[in-house]
Amino acid sequence: MAAMHTAGAADASAIAAKSISGEADSTALIAAEEQIPTWRQRDYTDVPIGTPYKYGDQVYKLWQAHDATNQPDWTPDKAVSLWDICHTTDPAKAKPYVAPQGTRGMYQIGDVCTEGGIIYRSTIDNNVWQPSAYPQGWKEMTDENI
């Protein structure tokens, strides 16, 4: 059991280092999400910017150092000034659509999401609209074009 924990910590450190250095993009982080630690209420002031954490079904990268020790509402999905959501280009790993916050979290060409059980691929950069609200910015993925 200790060996598995040590291996898991090493895997998490390796993917975090790649995220921080820019070697691992959001698609790579989501592909390795089983190795990414789960967010918890703690002090993030000494955590390097870009370090990935999982919260709910999403993967986020630390955007701004902060201390969430006494801030239970500073979760990545709510404290959007502190975290950046990751998107993927892999339809098999598509996550539910999440509205961007400001200039972060926008969908770029090739990013995928789900809405209503359907997988969509963004056909434009800086896409802030959900597929049903702006269908011309998305292409529905089918078995033929996945």
Can you say where each PLM-predicted feature lies in the sequence?
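Tryptophan-rich substrate-binding surfaces of secreted polymer-degrading and adhesive proteins
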Residues: 1-146
